[in-house]
């Protein structure tokens, strides 16, 4: 089981334009017993779907500008058997969208760093709240 933390984007520039801080905040909140998370900022490089395996956890942060790409990533991860967790301002304001359109197992509303370790533990236990 691996943990992927993804900032979705339709376009990759190959250089960091504005890398979101939340990627590293959640990485820092990931308990060490689960290993280092795989951080993917798609403004730098698109995610390789082959890296997502059954049982992995995929955290996707969306805002309105990248929501469609994020929802597509969630569906792809779900089809590969991964746990799909959404967060970010768009998911907070419109939590039904990731559930209805993005194959979400769960949506974190508000600051994710407070609940991220619990979300991971719930996925590992096979029982999300």
Protein language model features and the residues they cover:
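Nucleotide-activated donor-dependent transferases that construct or modify glycoconjugates
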Residues: 2-14, 57
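Glycine- and acidic-residue-enriched helix-capping/strand-helix junction motifs
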Residues: 12-23
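Glycine-rich beta-alpha loop elements in corrinoid/cobalamin-binding modules
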Residues: 26-129
